Amino acid sequence: MTVFPFPPDFPGLSVPFSVVGFDWDSGAPDGELLVLPRGCGAPAFDGPVFTPDAAFDDDRVLRPADAAPEHGPVWIEAFCPHGTLRSRLTAAVAAFGSRLWLHLAPMSTLYTLPCPDGAGTPVSDAERAALLAAHPSCFCPEFVCQCAHWPDSDIIRVLLYDTDETLAMQLALAAACGVPQVFGPLTTANSAAVLTD
């Protein structure tokens, strides 16, 4: 598995930047990813480009400009709205093989149940701290993240969030499931293999 550790304060998708990847097993440098937002590149650019085009299961794609859409790399998020993260990764590897790119980034989202569309509300660090002061959390093995839940009138509120430990567990699970490429704001705290030089 090749891991591309974006800096924790990476500039998102507004300016181009380059990320050196490393081999998960050996820790040796293994490839370079140029992140080039839509509209930032020359027409003849043939490197990876993030696009919001839908692929399989409403996931975004990471597609070389010179590759046909049906052969382009497929970008999926680690968040799993249905089933388990393990089943999501296993199914994605089976469907896309070497084309699969997993985006691994911390989540902090509040949901209201029932939640038929799977959409939640992003929660800031301060908001999350206030919620956790009032409601204890536990580890959720299905989603490989932390979870707090509580009743609120006739609904249930659910807070799902990541820690360095859960991100490290997600990265290890991705390797175990055969995910070929991972990218995101990984640090030495959540990935012991991330190079520091």
What are the residue ranges of the model-derived segments?
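Boundary/entry segment of secreted carbohydrate-active catalytic domains
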Residues: T2-G39
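Hydrophobic faces of well-ordered beta-strands that scaffold small-molecule active sites
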Residues: F17-F22, E32-L36, V49-P52, R60-R63, ...
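Short, acidic/polar
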Residues: D25-A28, P64-A67, D162-L173
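Extracytoplasmic/secreted cell-surface and envelope-processing proteins
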Residues: G41-A44, T84, L110-L113, N190-L195
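Substrate-binding surface in catalytic domains of secreted glycosidases
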Residues: P52-R128
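A structural motif corresponding to the C-terminal end of an alpha-helix
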Residues: A91-L100, M169-V182
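Glycan-binding loop/region signatures in secreted carbohydrate-active enzymes
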Residues: G97-T166
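Aromatic-rich peripheral "rim/lid" segments of glycoside hydrolase catalytic domains that contact
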Residues: Y161-T163, L186-D197
